Amino acid sequence: MSANGKISVPEAVVNWLFKVIQPIYNDGRTTFHDSLALLDNFHSLRPRTRVFTHSDGTPQLLLSIYGTISTGEDGSSPHSIPVIMWVPSMYPVKPPFISINLENFDMNTISSSLPIQEYIDSNGWIALPILHCWDPAAMNLIMVVQELMSLLHEPPQDQAPSLPPKPNTQLQQEQNTPPLPPKPKSPHLKPPLPPPPPPQPASNALDLMDMDNTDISPTNHHEMLQNLQTVVNELYREDVDYVADKILTRQTVMQESIARFHEIIAIDKNHLRAVEQAIEQTMHSLNAQIDVLTANRAKVQQFSSTSHVDDEDVNSIAVAKTDGLNQLYNLVAQDYALTDTIECLSRMLHRGTIPLDTFVKQGRELARQQFLVRWHIQRITSPLS
């Protein structure tokens, strides 16, 4: 990181790194952060994507960080080694794989007494101690490189490391995470070449940093960059269109929901307004009736205070002048009562409340009583007429 707090990795590399990490790794955020921090601290390292073949033969596209690790700041230390660090898809749960970059490894230019020879197996894999005691919560890619650099500082061993010869093609490195051909008995004897590997389809992922100027011409390099930029632009446009469609869909749904909510509120307001009006009308009617009752009560009280009903004989008011008229009054009232009773029985019969035999029996009895009552009424009224 520079003095002004910015990373020294180019912005194009940062964008490419973020783009290729997200679909491959389970914890893309941690992988991107640790990889970017490693590239920012060690400028001799470069990122790329390659097909990694596991021990069971399963191929997988992974991020690999390659370059030269040395004890000197300028990379000119005699104890320097080209390495490739493969970041597994389960990182940081699983530690990275680190091996010697056999493409750039030259036994004639590297010291014969490599300090880390005891950690290198016959296939070129480097078994660092940190990888055996890996702690996902406390360790990262920078610590792996730092441990490798610290091991390069150690005094050299007596015997030179026995490394496999450089493979003939880059395809062999991408196809297998070795096995490689057996090491030669003498560094002066050329080992027999291994049989050519079966062809492996090229990976569809584009590498921004993995471009060798010795293998391709500047024109091809420029065309590849243009193709990469075209792919990135297409992906960007697809993402923008997808996000815009999602936002438009959600916006439409939210607008419809808001409109329905306003409609419900308007309906509830109208209902409440109607209820309030009904309550006001009912209150007005009740108040008017209360006023009428209050006025009538006042009239009754006034009449009671001014009248002399208590002094009058009640019998003189409610009783007729003769006994015959009093008897006639009672008989007429009894006749009306019998008529109402017969009509009530008839309605009960139609409703099925009483059975027919009960209706007939009770109706006959009531008719007999009514006949007698009317006969008495006729006897009383005959002399009067």
From Swiss-Prot:
Record's keyword annotation contains Metal-binding: no
One cellular component (GO) term of this entry: cytosol
Keywords associated with the record: Coiled coil, Cytoplasm, Endosome, Membrane, Protein transport, Transport
SMART domains, alphabetized: UBCc
Coiled coil: 272-300
Sequence ranges of Polar residues compositional bias: 168-177
Occurrences of domain UEV (ranges): 12-161
PANTHER family listed in its UniProt record: TUMOR SUPPRESSOR PROTEIN 101, TUMOR SUSCEPTIBILITY GENE 101 PROTEIN-RELATED
Segments for region (Disordered): 155-219
Oligomeric form and interacting partners: Component of the ESCRT-I complex (endosomal sorting complex required for transport I) which consists of STP22, VPS28, SRN2 and MVB12 in a 1:1:1:1 stoichiometry. Interacts with HSE1 and VPS27. Interacts with MVB12 and SRN2.
Any GO BP: negative regulation of protein polyubiquitination
UniProt biased composition (Pro residues): 178-201
Membrane association type: Peripheral membrane protein
UniProt keyword Protein transport, yes or no: yes
Something else known: Present with 1360 molecules/cell in log phase SD medium.
Protein known as: Suppressor protein STP22 of temperature-sensitive alpha-factor receptor and arginine permease
Family (UniProt): Belongs to the ubiquitin-conjugating enzyme family. UEV subfamily.
Effect of F371D: Abolishes ESCRT-I complex assembly; class E phenotype (malformed late MVBs)
Entry's Gene Ontology molecular function annotations: ubiquitin binding
Subcellular location: Cytoplasm; Endosome; Late endosome membrane
Main subcellular location of this protein, as a coarse class: cytoplasm
Domains: entry comment: The UEV domain is required for the interaction of the complex with ubiquitin.
Protein species of origin: Saccharomyces cerevisiae (strain ATCC 204508 / S288c) (Baker's yeast)
Residue ranges constituting the SB domain according to the UniProt record: 322-385
Biological role stated in the UniProt entry: Component of the ESCRT-I complex, a regulator of vesicular trafficking process. Binds to ubiquitinated cargo proteins and is required for the sorting of endocytic ubiquitinated cargos into multivesicular bodies (MVBs). Mediates the association to the ESCRT-0 complex. Required for vacuolar targeting of temperature-sensitive plasma membrane proteins STE2 and CAN1.
